[in-house]
């Protein structure tokens, strides 16, 4: 009697492309401590045939992300796209309408290739002014509703204000936060992947 072990190769896996800025690029973390690596492990533990390709870039804006996306989709050929962009646009005070336009164009590009899109809500500090903060944060719901894509909660909601979870800059999560981010993202994604 022959026994066959069940193993998945990269070509068998459905690929999630993580496409974000320094938060998803694991700013200040060695690769093995980044939340995207922890997310890979969670998928393995649950025997989900999901691969992760992280093409996040520190400092990326929605405009830069839009400019790069076509080539990256050609290279990776993902089944799913998780967009975590916009924070750097807000840091530069870019108009919310421009950010929304860039997000919508990225979504359109992915959907035209039959890629399921997950859009991550981004939140910013109130020191940009309440009006700008509200306008900025509302674009994610607008984009998700206009384009009929899944809006995921901000991954730092339960982390950013927790003591001992952020780097000294107060913007980037530290090594203690990485597995928690992975678990939050995993819990938010899994219902849509089964």
Role assignments for model-derived ranges:
Residues 10, 64-194:
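Alpha-helical cap/lid subdomain in secreted, periplasmic
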Residues 6-58, 68-77:
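Serine-esterase "nucleophile elbow" of acetyl-processing enzymes
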Residues 1-2:
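Bacterial N-terminal signal peptides
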Residues 28-30, 53-61, 90-94, 169-170:
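Acidic/histidine-rich helix-loop elements
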Residues 24-25, 59, 124, 161:
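Active-site micro-motifs of SAM-dependent methyltransferase domains
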């Amino acid at each position: 009697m022959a026994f066959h072990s069940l193993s998945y190769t990269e070509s068998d896996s459905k690929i999630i492309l993580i496409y974000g800025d320094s938060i998803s690029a694991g700013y200040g973390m060695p690769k093995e401590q980044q939340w995207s690596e922890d997310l890979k492990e969670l998928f393995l533990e649950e025997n989900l045939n999901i691969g992760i390709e992280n093409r996040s870039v520190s400092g990326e804006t929605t405009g830069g992300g839009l400019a790069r996306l076509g080539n990256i989709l050609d290279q990776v050929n993902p089944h799913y796209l998780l967009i975590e962009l916009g924070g750097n646009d807000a840091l530069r005070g870019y108009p919310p309408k421009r950010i929304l336009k860039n997000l919508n164009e990225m979504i359109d590009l992915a959907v035209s290739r039959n890629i399921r899109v997950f859009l991550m809500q981004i939140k910013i500090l109130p020191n940009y002014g309440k009006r700008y903060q509200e306008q900025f944060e509302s674009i994610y719901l607008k984009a998700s509703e206009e384009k009929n894509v899944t809006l995921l909660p901000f991954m730092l909601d339960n982390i950013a204000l927790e003591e001992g979870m952020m780097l000294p800059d107060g913007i980037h999560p530290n090594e203690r936060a990485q597995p928690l981010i992975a678990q939050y993202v995993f819990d938010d994604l899994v219902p849509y992947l089964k």
